[in-house]
Each structure stands twice: as structure tokens, then as C-alpha cells.
């Protein structure tokens, strides 16, 4: 039986500023670095035989929490990347809430219906991310593996391998930053022990998705806004 820990990356700039990160390669915030310290302590005495990560910067930095105490190479896999958001890459949530609230609602609450020019669909992400996870599990029989990925990508891969509808946000939430999913893999099947455990974070380190304010960040021309 293979034991798998799937970890979402620490808080990055896009999380702090409520921006669609997608494949944009932003930095990890100071709070995110503290989350990584807490994550490292959580896994200090957990046996880890192999480590895989998305090749984006925020996941590679988060994966260093594992290499801090475990002498395992970090194996990068682009299939573990976050969903590509097409024309929404680097857009602020506040702008999207103002300009296209219906489409943003679809992205968050009706993911099986979401489509956007140039962006991946949830189904496409589920296929590539679950393919990577199945390959990792099959290549590591009877070992303990850590996999560092992204919020939507984790949600998509879990939907695929656990058979949970992608729209079931109650049983399939987007993990918190450095939130941990614990799976077991045996004879081609996955079972979940827990999803989104962030007990290693305390106080201000435990930033939950959706608990942040989304601001607009657009230039307003006073000549075009005479509503005062």
C-alpha cells in the first residue's frame, strides 16, 4: 500500500492580493514562508520516501519544507500545475466580480460548466493531474510520497481518483494554503483518510480560502464617471 500526502502551496502573492494566479509564477509571501516553517515541523518526523512538485515557483518553495528534514530529490512535473486561466491570468477577483460576476460564479460554484477562451476546463485539469497522481502512486509501491500542487488542481485530481463530483464543494473543498490531503493507494484504487487538514497552522497563519476581501484594481477616469 502506498501512502500519499498531497499539499497545497503556501500563501503566494496571488492569494494575498486575490488574483487569478493560474500558471503565473509569483512569489511566496512572508506569511507563506512562515506557513512553510510550520509545514516542515509537521513533517519532520514523518517518513517520506519520494517528493513530487509542480514546477511553478510557489510549489517548489513549499516543497522545501519536506527537503528540510528529508534527503529526497524534488521531482518536478508540469502536470501538477494549477489550472491555466487564459485571459483571466493575473486578473483581480474584484475586477472579475465587477465585470463578469456570472462567469466568476460559474468558475467557483459550477465548475463542471465553466469554460473561458484560452483557459483549461476543470475536466482537462482533472485528466492531466490525476494521470500524474496515478503514475506517481504506481511507481512508488509500499512507499510514502509527498506531492505539492495547487488548489484547483488538487480539487480536480481528487474528484477524478475518488469519484466525487467536481461541484461537490462540501466534500471536495479547495485546500487552504499548505493544507494537507492524506490518501492511500492499493491495487489501483485511492481512499482518503482526510482532506484539507491544516492543524499545523495556528492563529494568523491559518488563512482560509474565501475569508479575504476582493478589491478592484482598475484606473478610473473621472471624466467618464460623473456620478457625484
Language-model features: locations:
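Acidic, low-complexity terminal tails and accessory targeting/binding regions
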Residues: 2, 83-95, 143, 159-228
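Generic beta-sheet signal
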Residues: 4, 135, 143-149
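Active-site metal-binding loops of divalent metal-dependent hydrolases
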Residues: 10, 151, 198
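Amphipathic, non-transmembrane alpha-helical scaffold segments
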Residues: 25, 29, 33, 56, ...
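Glycine-rich phosphate-binding loop signature in dinucleotide/nucleotide-binding domains
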Residues: 44-47, 136-143
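Short beta-strand scaffold positions
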Residues: 53-54, 127, 148-149
Amino acid at each position: 500500500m502506498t501512502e500519499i500526502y498531497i499539499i497545497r502551496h503556501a500563501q503566494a502573492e496571488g492569494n494575498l492580493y486575490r488574483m487569478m494566479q493560474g500558471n503565473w509564477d509569483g512569489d511566496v509571501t512572508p506569511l507563506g514562508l512562515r506557513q512553510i516553517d510550520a509545514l516542515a515541523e509537521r513533517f519532520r518526523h514523518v517518513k517520506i520516501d519520494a517528493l513530487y512538485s509542480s514546477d511553478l515557483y510557489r510549489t517548489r518553495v513549499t516543497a522545501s519544507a519536506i527537503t528540510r528534514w528529508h534527503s529526497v530529490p524534488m521531482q518536478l512535473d508540469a502536470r501538477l500545475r494549477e489550472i491555466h486561466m487564459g485571459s483571466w491570468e493575473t486578473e483581480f477577483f474584484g475586477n472579475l466580480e465587477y465585470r463578469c460576476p456570472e462567469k466568476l460564479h460559474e468558475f467557483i460554484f459550477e465548475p463542471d460548466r465553466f469554460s473561458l477562451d484560452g483557459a483549461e476546463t476543470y475536466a482537462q485539469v482533472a485528466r492531466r493531474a490525476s494521470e500524474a497522481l496515478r503514475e506517481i502512486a504506481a511507481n512508488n509501491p509500499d512507499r510514502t510520497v509527498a506531492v505539492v500542487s495547487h488548489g484547483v488542481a488538487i480539487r480536480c485530481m481528487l474528484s477524478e481518483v475518488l469519484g466525487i463530483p467536481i461541484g461537490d464543494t462540501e466534500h471536495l473543498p479547495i485546500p487552504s494554503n499548505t493544507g494537507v490531503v492524506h490518501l492511500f493507494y492499493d491495487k489501483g484504487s485511492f481512499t482518503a483518510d482526510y482532506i484539507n487538514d491544516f492543524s499545523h497552522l495556528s492563529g494568523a497563519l491559518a488563512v482560509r480560502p474565501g475569508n479575504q476581501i476582493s478589491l478592484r484594481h482598475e484606473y478610473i477616469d473621472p471624466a467618464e464617471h460623473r456620478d457625484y
